[in-house]
Amino acid sequence: MHEKLTTRFAPSPTGYLHIGGLRTALYNYLYARKNGGNFLLRIEDTDLKRNSKEATKAIIEAFKWCGLEHDGEVTYQSERFDLYKEYVKKLLDEGKAYYCYMSKEELEELRAKQEAAKERPRYDGRYREFTGTPPQGIEPVVRIKAPQSGEIVFEDGVKGEVRFKAEDIMDDFIIARSDGTPTYNFTVVIDDALMGVSDVIRGDDHLSNTPKQIVLYEALGFKIPKFFHVAMIHGEDGKKLSKRHGATDVMEYKEMGILPQALLNFLVRLGWSHGDDEVFSLEDLKKLFDPYHINKSASCYNAKKLEWLNAHYIKTLPFEEINRQLKDLGFDLSVYEKAGFLLDLLRERAKTLHDIINGAKSIVNAPQNYDENAVQKFVNENNLELLQAFANTLKDQKTGKDFEDFTNDFLEKKEAKLKDLAQPIRIALTGSAVSPSIFEVLEFLGVDECKKRIDNFLKVRGK
């Protein structure tokens, strides 16, 4: 029977969801969807001191915002401690793991000797075959009997064949601490196996964990999944992406007015490509994405590319989707008359949703003040008179074309040019010298409102 391809995303809720984490989640999601498989979400919250309910909530909110739907219920490792203990006991009973009674002092002494001899710090296996009376006052840890020689080899979907010499990278590592809590590598293996995870796509910072996990899969008799280790995202300076490069929290991008469609499109291209194509919808990606085509080398974050993609999606997504995202930012475009026309007015120049919000407010609301720099630059006695004459002559124009034809005729009669009038009109109508096409703004506002705003501006200028 052919097993169902199953991937997972398994964040630790000790902080916000980083965009590198979102890219990992996206790769796992797309691979599962392409193959009709399952995409699971597991919260690795065994570190009870550092866990945060707010962080867990933020991870789930980020998934919802991005439209990455996981299958089944969320799995919480903190609810599975009894299960992990069962498997620790199983390995102890089978002689594949053992109690280690090494004291803190013994461990420090061993490390000091190894350091002095310029050896790699490692546990020396002194309790591996211990059968004597356990020393008093020591709460033991549990260690796995790891291979002491030979190679651990696996075929990575991104990096190709990966080899580790057991003696170079491994000692009998701890699977349960002295307080009984399981370690990271142990819980990951138990959960991936029992959840039926067949393919693991994760950052290559986990590469060094893989040989240890393979040792555990083999000791427990579980099938080893296929691994794909993806290179990190770097900043534009070539260093590992961090807060100094800009936003890294997924939900910060939402607050910045970035659309989830743009962010996902941007992230999938940081490490994967399909020909020279730049723009991919989520539906496209579900058909096209292949983790075997992920680049081996690190990708560089490019803020300009994200801005370009965001502008593209603002231009092309339907009104309902743009307004749904605007509502999440506390702004509802649909309350305005001619809302669709207003969006079309603004979307051609907008780079973020805040450009839509600010642009809509500047057009819909009569200006309470005027950009003084723009006034100084573009307004003078001559064009104030021209503006007054323009307002007085406006009559029954309705469409942008009506206003354009009227303006051209008016300027011809006055022997003036559009540059003499366009900026004063913009400033009078919106308070700023930056706006969409003045003819479309005139159409949106209508003759009466335009006259009212121009008259108000002229009064402020002493006319």
UniProtKB/Swiss-Prot annotation:
GO cellular component: cytosol
Keyword Ligase: yes
InterPro entries referenced in this protein's UniProt entry, alphabetically: aa-tRNA-synth_I_cd-bd (IPR045462), aa-tRNA-synth_I_codon-bd_sub2 (IPR020751), aa-tRNA-synth_I_CS (IPR001412), aa_tRNA-synth_I_cd-bd_sf (IPR008925), Glu-tRNA-ligase_bac/mito (IPR004527), Glu/Gln-tRNA-synth (IPR000924), Glu/Gln-tRNA-synth_Ib_cat-dom (IPR020058), GluQ/Sye (IPR049940)
Family as reported in the entry's similarity comment: Belongs to the class-I aminoacyl-tRNA synthetase family. Glutamate--tRNA ligase type 1 subfamily.
Encoding gene per record: gltX2
Catalysed reactions listed for this entry: tRNA(Glu) + L-glutamate + ATP = L-glutamyl-tRNA(Glu) + AMP + diphosphate
Superkingdom to which the source organism belongs: Bacteria
Alphabetical keyword list: Aminoacyl-tRNA synthetase, ATP-binding, Cytoplasm, Ligase, Nucleotide-binding, Protein biosynthesis
UniProt motif ('HIGH' region) ranges: 11-21
Protein name: Glutamate--tRNA ligase 2
Residues noted as binding ATP in the record, renumbered to the chain: 243
Subunit (UniProt): Monomer.
PROSITE patterns per UniProt: AA_TRNA_LIGASE_I
Lineage: Bacteria, Pseudomonadati, Campylobacterota, Epsilonproteobacteria, Campylobacterales
Molecular-function annotations in GO: ATP binding; glutamate-tRNA ligase activity; tRNA binding; zinc ion binding
Subcellular location: Cytoplasm
SUPFAM superfamilies attached to this UniProt entry: An anticodon-binding domain of class I aminoacyl-tRNA synthetases (SSF48163), Nucleotidylyl transferase (SSF52374)
Its job: Catalyzes the attachment of glutamate to tRNA(Glu) in a two-step reaction: glutamate is first activated by ATP to form Glu-AMP and then transferred to the acceptor end of tRNA(Glu).
Disulfide bonds: none
GO biological process: glutamyl-tRNA aminoacylation
Enzyme class: ligase
'KMSKS' region, short sequence motif: residues: 240-244
Keyword ATP-binding: yes
EC number: 6.1.1.17
